[in-house]
């Protein structure tokens, strides 16, 4: 690692610790030439993921786009900003894990719905209404009925 003050490439590591929820390593270093101390962060470089669109197009995965869509669905719910960020990070991890460079946009949408359904029913309905292009009240009612049915099944399995 190059020293920011003298550009020497020899340094020693004074301290290492996990950072960013285990996704990177923070290292405190000291230059062997000028004794300047500095901090570096190391993280695994991930391969870019391409999203295969329904129209046949392809674009790079955009975490900000994911965050925007989920944030809109979670407006005025009990989801905090930090919970949304953690939720998006979790979805991103699943996308990277599930894909081998390419992932279908429909797979991302279903992944979000599956996870939102567990976390917040209101956010789930909001996201589903946009993702599945609800045309009217009947679409909302059928989705609410399926939510209601799965809630009853979960309660029955607990009893």
Swiss-Prot record:
<keyword id="KW-0805">Transcription regulation</keyword>
<dbReference type="InterPro" id="IPR005144">
    <property type="entry name" value="ATP-cone_dom"/>
</dbReference>
<keyword id="KW-0547">Nucleotide-binding</keyword>
<dbReference type="Pfam" id="PF03477">
    <property type="entry name" value="ATP-cone"/>
</dbReference>
<feature type="domain" description="ATP-cone">
    <location>
        <begin position="49"/>
        <end position="139"/>
    </location>
</feature>
<keyword id="KW-0678">Repressor</keyword>
<keyword id="KW-0863">Zinc-finger</keyword>
<keyword id="KW-0804">Transcription</keyword>
<dbReference type="GO" id="GO:0008270">
    <property type="term" value="F:zinc ion binding"/>
</dbReference>
<dbReference type="GO" id="GO:0003677">
    <property type="term" value="F:DNA binding"/>
</dbReference>
<dbReference type="InterPro" id="IPR003796">
    <property type="entry name" value="RNR_NrdR-like"/>
</dbReference>
<dbReference type="GO" id="GO:0045892">
    <property type="term" value="P:negative regulation of DNA-templated transcription"/>
</dbReference>
<dbReference type="Pfam" id="PF22811">
    <property type="entry name" value="Zn_ribbon_NrdR"/>
</dbReference>
<feature type="compositionally biased region" description="Polar residues">
    <location>
        <begin position="1"/>
        <end position="11"/>
    </location>
</feature>
<dbReference type="GO" id="GO:0005524">
    <property type="term" value="F:ATP binding"/>
</dbReference>
<protein>
    <recommendedName>
        <fullName>Transcriptional repressor NrdR</fullName>
    </recommendedName>
</protein>
<feature type="region of interest" description="Disordered">
    <location>
        <begin position="1"/>
        <end position="21"/>
    </location>
</feature>
<comment type="similarity">
    <text>Belongs to the NrdR family.</text>
</comment>
<dbReference type="InterPro" id="IPR055173">
    <property type="entry name" value="NrdR-like_N"/>
</dbReference>
<keyword id="KW-0067">ATP-binding</keyword>
<keyword id="KW-0862">Zinc</keyword>
<keyword id="KW-0479">Metal-binding</keyword>
<keyword id="KW-0238">DNA-binding</keyword>
<comment type="function">
    <text>Negatively regulates transcription of bacterial ribonucleotide reductase nrd genes and operons by binding to NrdR-boxes.</text>
</comment>
<feature type="zinc finger region">
    <location>
        <begin position="3"/>
        <end position="34"/>
    </location>
</feature>
């Amino acid at each position: 690692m190059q020293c920011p003050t003298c550009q020497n490439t020899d340094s020693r590591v004074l301290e290492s610790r996990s950072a960013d929820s285990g996704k990177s390593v923070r290292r405190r270093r000291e230059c062997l030439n000028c004794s300047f101390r500095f901090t570096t962060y190391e993280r695994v470089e991930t391969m870019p993921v391409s999203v295969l669109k329904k129209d046949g197009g392809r674009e790079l995965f955009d975490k900000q786009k994911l965050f925007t869509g989920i944030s809109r669905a979670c407006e005025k719910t009990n989801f905090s900003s930090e919970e949304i960020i953690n939720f998006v990070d979790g979805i991103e991890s699943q996308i990277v894990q599930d894909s081998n460079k390419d992932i279908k946009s429909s797979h991302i949408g279903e992944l979000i719905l599956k996870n939102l359904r567990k976390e917040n029913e209101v956010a789930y309905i909001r996201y589903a209404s946009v993702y599945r292009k609800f045309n009217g009240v009947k679409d909302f009612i059928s989705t609410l009925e399926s939510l209601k049915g799965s809630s009853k099944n979960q309660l029955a399995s607990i009893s």
